[in-house]
Every structure is written in structure tokens, then in C-alpha cells.
Design a protein with these regions (language model features):
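Metal-associated gating/positioning segment near the N- to mid-region
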Residues: 50-117
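A glycine-rich helix N-cap at a beta->alpha junction
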Residues: 112-128
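His/Asp/Glu-enriched, well-ordered alpha-helical/loop segment
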Residues: 203-231, 298-302, 306-308, 313-389
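Histidine-rich, glycine-flanked metal-binding segment
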Residues: 1-4, 10-56
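Divalent metal-coordination and catalytic microenvironments
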Residues: 9, 22, 27, 51, ...
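Histidine/acidic residue-rich metal-binding segments in metalloenzymes
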Residues: 134-308
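C-terminal cap of metal-dependent C-N hydrolases
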Residues: 9, 323, 377-442
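Short catalytic-loop micro-motif centered on adjacent basic/acidic residues
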Residues: 93, 123-126, 233-238
Length: 446
């Protein structure tokens, strides 16, 4: 049985940084050694991690891998490789594919695809519609990460817009409800207003006014109200405004029934970046003001925001052409998500410990994933080794997503992902992917 020693790393885990070493054996963390402590038995492989930080692998609860049916943009293989290169060891895939994951049959087909193609650990959401809530009772709570609810229209047109249906969804499942919250009526009013002035060529810079602060707040407010009425387990995804933060609490995560996610893009960019990046940063909900970004960053620290994810959503560059009404919404972010957040830590926005909490610990806790998300003895060895002070620049050559572009092209990072271990297997090693490896299906202890 192979034993691998990762030696002399700064281990970041559960709010602490310690110099130490980790032994991997049979997929799991066998020993955690502090300082000069020695392994209890010989190791077959020794990795000198001097100068590196060892983190639990990120768990990205919010990805769109476009498989099945939209594989001209992305597929499970390419995007899971991008995940591994970014230090992400587990993903949860969204249902707005073709066919949509809104039936039990489509759900089983998605699990089969993920098992055949994903290099990292995986689960997927069941998509809610106006009419399919009767199927919720048949969902396996140990396999399905949650129910995805689009309360605002986005890529895939899975909008649930009937109040009776919303009440049935919130009252009809014990699973986590992951909600995309934007009020469709307000979006339509805003769109009609600007179409009178610009026709179908509404400028891209007006995207945050079409999908406005009020559209986000009203929909999130309704979701919170319904969750409180039904005691549903609600997780609102990609919060984008300061105003929405008033809907959430910063009590300890274990006490929450209503949680909130911020995405890397909303923590990095502001509406001013449309001038240089254009449709590359067009997403739903829209990138908004610098004040909103600052409030979201502060909410990560205060506990109003519980997790950081990516909403990784690739499109071809040709599909990103046009203004606010024509360019498709979404961007690939998973490969550079962890290093982007570590860069914000260098700038004093977060601590490294907080990045680990929001990208690894909290997703494992919220989704009730046992034996992952922490560096603990007996846990699965989902680990990432990152090196600071290792300057490199994002180019198309290094992008593993099938779409082959990123809004971060030409950006220079000081942090670099060197190695990613999934279930103890060295999946990513300094630019090289083991294309033969497949991740494991996530299990939820509910």
C-alpha cells in the first residue's frame, strides 16, 4: 500500500497555519505531523513542499460543465481538468444542460456521464420546474446535492415563475434548495425601458441596470420569506448586491437554515471593468458597483456570506459577442478561482484561513459531505499544494477549459497551484494532468 509524505508545508486548516507534513495512504490522510514530527512508518514517496502551503481541496458547489448537449462550449472532461489545475477537488454541476436535469431519468444519465468523465469528485443538482415537484420525494438525499431553482431566467430557460409552484417547491423537499434570485418582472420593465432608447442594441454597460439591484433584492427577499414560512433549507447563490446582505445572518454556520454564496467574479470585478473586458464578464446576476463588491468582500469576513464558488459557465467567444441583450451570460472561472482569492488575501481583503474556510470547509458543512473539506486524519486526501511568490501570467496556452479563454487573460498571479491530490491520487502536477484518473461520486450524510 503506497504511502506518500508531503513534507515541510505550511498547513492551512480550521483557522490555523502550522508548519508540518501530511502522510497519504490508501486514498486517505493517514498522519498529520507538526513541526519536526516523523512519520510512524516508512513512506514510498516524499514530496518536498518547502515554501508551499497545503490546503484542503476546494469544493465548488456551483458549476456549469455543459454536458450533456452543449459540449461545443465545454464538457465534463475538459472542465474537470481545469478544476484540478485550479485546486478544486470536488464539483456540483447545474441542471441547465440539454436535456435539462429535471427528470429522474435525466438525473441518472447525468450521474453516469459524470462517473465516466469527471477527473474530480462530483455530484449534480436536480432542476426544479413549474411542474416537477412531485418527483422530489424520489430523489436520493445521499446522492443529489440539492434542488436548483431558477427564480430568474438565465441560460437554459428554466424559470419557475408561478407562486403556487414556488410554494410547492419550498414545501416539498428536505434537500437544500439552491436558488438563482432575480425578479423577472423587474428585469422585463428595465429591458423594455432601455429598448425604447436603444432598440435591440442596448449597450453592454447597462447590463447591471437591466438585471438591477432591485431585481436581485426582491427575488432574494421572496425566497427568504418562503424558506422561513416552510422551514426549507435555502441557499441563495451568487449574491451580487450590498442590499441583499440585509436578508442574512452571521450566526454560526451550523445554526443556519438560510445561507448565501458569493462568486469569485463578483468579488473580483466591478461595473467599471465592462470598459476593458466587455462581455467576457457578462453574467447573471450582473457584475455591479465597487460599493457592492466591497460589501460582498466584507460579508465574507463577517459571516453573512457562507461560501465562495465560481458559477463556472463557459461559452465560446463567438457567443459572447453583442450588447446587453445578445451576448450570452457566463464565464469560465474555475481554473483561476483559488489563486484569485489567495491574491485578495495578499491584498488584505481576506486571510488565507478565511479563503480555505469559504472554499473548502463551509461547502462540506453546508452540503453535509463527510470526510472531505478539511485536513483531518482519516479524511479523504483531497489536497492542493500552492506556492506563493511564484509569478506567472495567464495565457490561452495554459487554459484547460474547452472554450480557451478567460476574463483573467494577461493577468499575472503570484500564487501558483503546483499539485492537486484527489482521493490521494496526484491528479495535477505542475501543468500535467493524469487523464486516466476519475473522481468519486460525493456522498451526503443527511
Amino acid at each position: 500500500m503506497k504511502r506518500t509524505l508531503i513534507q515541510n508545508a505550511v498547513i492551512v486548516n480550521e483557522g490555523r497555519k502550522v508548519l508540518g507534513s501530511v502522510v497519504i495512504e490508501n486514498e486517505k490522510i493517514a498522519e498529520i505531523l507538526v513541526g519536526e514530527e516523523k512519520a510512524t512508518a516508512p513512506c514510498d514517496e516524499v514530496i518536498d513542499a518547502s515554501g508551499c502551503y497545503l490546503l484542503p481541496g476546494a469544493i465548488d458547489e456551483h458549476v456549469h460543465f455543459r454536458d450533456p448537449g452543449l459540449t461545443h462550449k465545454a464538457d465534463i472532461t475538459t472542465e474537470s481538468h481545469a478544476a484540478a489545475a485550479g485546486g478544486v477537488t470536488s464539483i456540483m454541476d447545474m441542471p441547465n444542460t440539454n436535456p435539462q436535469t429535471t427528470t429522474l431519468e435525466a438525473l441518472e444519465e447525468k450521474f453516469i456521464l459524470l462517473g465516466e468523465k469527471s477527473a474530480v469528485n462530483y455530484s449534480c443538482y436536480f432542476g426544479a420546474t413549474n411542474n416537477n415537484y412531485t418527483q422530489f420525494a424520489q430523489l436520493d438525499k445521499h446522492r443529489v446535492c440539492g434542488v436548483k431553482l431558477f427564480m430568474g431566467s438565465s441560460t437554459g430557460n428554466m424559470l419557475v415563475d408561478r407562486m403556487a409552484s414556488l410554494r410547492n417547491i419550498f414545501g416539498g423537499t428536505d434537500l437544500l434548495i439552491a436558488a438563482h434570485c432575480e425578479d423577472q418582472g423587474i428585469i422585463k420593465e428595465n429591458t423594455d425601458k432601455y429598448k425604447k432608447e436603444y432598440g435591440d442594441d442596448v449597450p453592454l454597460a447597462l447590463h447591471p441596470l437591466l438585471r438591477s439591484e432591485e431585481a436581485c433584492y426582491r427575488s432574494s427577499e421572496l425566497a427568504v420569506q418562503l424558506a422561513r414560512e416552510t422551514n426549507a433549507r435555502l441557499h441563495i447563490m451568487h449574491i451580487s448586491t450590498a442590499k441583499e446582505l440585509s436578508l442574512f445572518s452571521n450566526v454560526p454556520l451550523a445554526q443556519k437554515r438560510i445561507t448565501a454564496e458569493a462568486c469569485v467574479s463578483h468579488l473580483l470585478f466591478t461595473e467599471e471593468d465592462y470598459q476593458t473586458l466587455g462581455a467576457r464578464i457578462k453574467c447573471n446576476p450582473a457584475i455591479k458597483t465597487a460599493q457592492d463588491r466591497k460589501a460582498l468582500q466584507e460579508a465574507v469576513n463577517s459571516g453573512l456570506i457562507d461560501a465562495i464558488a465560481t458559477d463556472h459557465a463557459p461559452h465560446l467567444l463567438s457567443e459572447k459577442e453583442g450588447g446587453a441583450l445578445k451576448a450570452m451570460s457566463g464565464m469560465p472561472m474555475i481554473q483561476f478561482s483559488l489563486v484569485s482569492m489567495l491574491e485578495l488575501a495578499d491584498k488584505g481583503v481576506f486571510t488565507i484561513e478565511k479563503v480555505v474556510e469559504k472554499m473548502a470547509h463551509a461547502p462540506a458543512q453546508m452540503y453535509e459531505i463527510p470526510n472531505r473539506g478539511f485536513i483531518r486524519k482519516g479524511y479523504q486526501a483531497d489536497l492542493v499544494l500552492v506556492r506563493p511568490d511564484s509569478e506567472w501570467t495567464v495565457t490561452t496556452d495554459c487554459i484547460l477549459s474547452k472554450c480557451k479563454w478567460s476574463p483573467l487573460e494577461e493577468h499575472t498571479f503570484d500564487w501558483k497551484v503546483e499539485k492537486t491530490f484527489v482521493n490521494g491520487h496526484l491528479l495535477y502536477n505542475n501543468g500535467e494532468i493524469d487523464e486516466t484518473y476519475r473522481g468519486q461520486e460525493l456522498f451526503f450524510e443527511r
